[in-house]
């Protein structure tokens, strides 16, 4: 004999029909059906009321929630998300609170978690693949603590616009404030980058240091890691700082900005380079003025950044100054200097520049450009780049310096 199949609805109907006969007491009915008296008195009034579908489960949700988000606030949250499609709940909350402060309307906005729930219900949140964190390796460059203490510079990976034009976006950010100083399509050569930097320096001023990778045109494998571009930085009094090779995590703030730049301006690319540059200009304004950053206390970069105090010098740059105990040599066009009757190769990036040569405790001679040590000329007259740690140079009294061509 097969088992009798039943359901909660069928059991409720049978319970009330048996109760209607008057044969069983309430206690007996509850024992027969395996329910409590409290459950019986939940269903009995519904059966008596004559409701058409009294036997169905009802929603247990509260009829009214006094702390539910006002519909107008939810609509405003959704509108901000549609305007800034890459803003998450925290940025939306910060942006709305800043807007309320400017207007002085005193609106209280819900928590970021509630905003996230509102966006999910509106179908505005897509599940994202979790990114595996990279393991940091090597020496990490110390972070900047004040605006213009250090800028970061790099090229965002090149791509082509719809008409086939190649775009190489040069990006510059301030490390401390995250301020996006420039996004400009330039020729990826030292001359192209120098021209773009001259415009920036002349417009807003210069930082104390610039952080970059050691690739062309920012650095090289030559003496001191210098390139023609970083030699120019040193002459301007800007310290070149290089992250270790294959260590983009040491420039993580800049790389994170690149992800946002790509998502909001080049997916898909514009029709032409001119139109793409317009997108970059619009993104720069939005990134600096509208987009809150969690690391900045949900403030926009423009609220923290201020123009540099150092101005771009006009006219020809002067040669570096060296202590009196240095022999000064002019680097020839092919990268050599004349040292004790022989030509010693230093580096083509320094062609035409003055370098200083001073005695070293090891018996050799240390070579430097400005305040950057380049290497050591050994007793065999060979130049060794990136020499081992060395003793501090002796500081002599100031005296006239002669230049040997």
PLM feature segments, named:
Residues 68, 113, 117-174, 179, ...:
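Mobile-element integrase/transposase regions
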Residues 222, 228-314, 356, 360-361:
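Charged alpha-helix within mobile-element recombinases
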Residues 7-24, 74, 78-83:
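Short, amphipathic alpha-helical "recognition" segments used to contact nucleic acids or chromatin
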Residues 45, 51-152, 158, 227, ...:
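Basic, flexible linker segments flanking DNA-binding modules
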Residues 15, 29-30, 40-43, 51, ...:
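Mobile genetic element proteins and their domesticated derivatives, centered on retroelements
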Residues 1-14, 63-71:
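Short, Lys/Arg-enriched anionic-surface-contact patches
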Residues 288-405:
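C-terminal, beta-rich DNA-binding module of retroviral/retroelements integrases
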Residues 188, 202-222, 244-246, 251, ...:
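Acidic/histidine-rich, metal-coordinating catalytic segments
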């Amino acid at each position: 004999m097969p088992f009798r199949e039943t359901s909660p609805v069928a059991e409720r109907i049978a319970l009330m029909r048996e109760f209607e006969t008057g044969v069983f007491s309430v206690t007996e009915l509850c024992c027969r059906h395996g329910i409590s008296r409290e459950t019986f008195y939940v269903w009995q009034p519904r059966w008596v009321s004559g409701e058409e579908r009294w036997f169905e489960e009802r929603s247990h949700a509260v009829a009214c929630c006094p702390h539910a988000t006002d519909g107008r606030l939810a609509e405003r949250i959704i509108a901000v998300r549609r305007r800034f499609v890459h803003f998450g709940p925290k940025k939306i909350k910060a942006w709305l609170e800043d807007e309320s402060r400017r207007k002085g309307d005193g609106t209280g906005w819900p928590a970021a978690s509630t905003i996230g729930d509102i966006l999910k219900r509106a179908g505005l949140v897509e599940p994202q693949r979790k990114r595996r964190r990279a393991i940091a390796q090597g020496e990490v460059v110390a972070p900047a603590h004040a605006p213009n203490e250090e800028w970061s510079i790099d090229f965002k990976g090149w791509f082509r616009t719809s008409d086939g034009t190649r775009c190489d976006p040069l990006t510059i950010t301030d490390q401390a404030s995250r301020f996006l100083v420039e996004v400009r399509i330039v020729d990826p050569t030292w001359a192209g980058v120098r021209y773009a930097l001259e415009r920036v320096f002349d417009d807003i001023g210069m930082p104390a240091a610039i952080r970059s990778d050691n690739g062309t045109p920012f650095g090289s494998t030559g003496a001191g890691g210098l390139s023609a571009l970083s030699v120019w930085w040193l002459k301007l009094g800007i310290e070149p700082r290089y992250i270790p090779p294959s260590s983009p995590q040491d420039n993580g703030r800049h790389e994170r900005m690149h992800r946002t730049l790509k998502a909001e301006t080049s997916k898909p690319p514009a029709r032409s380079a001119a139109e793409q540059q317009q997108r970059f200009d619009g993104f720069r304004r939005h990134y600096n003025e509208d987009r809150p950053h969690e690391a900045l206390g949900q403030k926009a970069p423009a609220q923290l950044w201020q123009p540099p105090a150092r101005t771009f010098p006009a006219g020809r740059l002067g040669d570096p100054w060296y202590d009196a105990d240095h022999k000064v040599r002019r680097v020839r066009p092919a990268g050599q200097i004349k040292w004790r009757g022989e030509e010693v190769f230093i580096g083509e990036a320094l062609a035409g520049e003055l370098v200083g040569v001073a005695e070293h405790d090891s018996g050799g001679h240390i070579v430097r450009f400005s305040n950057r040590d380049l290497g050591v000329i050994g007793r065999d007259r060979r130049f060794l780049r990136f020499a081992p740690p060395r003793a501090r140079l002796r500081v002599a009294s100031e005296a006239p310096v002669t230049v040997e061509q």
